[in-house]
Amino acid sequence: MPKTSILALSFAVAASSLIAVPDARAQSCGQLWYERNSIYKAAGYCFRTPRAISAFGNAGCTYDSEYDVPLSPWQRRRVADIRAMEREFGCPR
């Protein structure tokens, strides 16, 4: 295989691995909203807004207050990071 082909293949593999890593900053407000609320849904939160109820439903929900939802330290950190990005990007509340 010629050197240029090997170099091109190496670059393509490296570039594809970079693209495969989710870049949170490239996410849209909608994607951030969905990811944040997916964390709450998985933990049993009962949604109040029509948008969230439409997207996730309330079947099987247990917790009316987001502060009562049992999240792991990683999940709490991720929710805090998402909220910070939503503020930074000026996402609607």
Describe each region flagged by the PLM.
Residues A24-R93:
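Post-signal/leader-peptide non-cytosolic segments of secretory proteins
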Residues A8, A14-D23:
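C-terminal segment of classical bacterial N-terminal signal peptides
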Residues M1-S10:
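Bacterial N-terminal signal peptides that target proteins for export
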Residues V13-A14, A42:
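Residue-level signal for pocket-adjacent positions within structured domains
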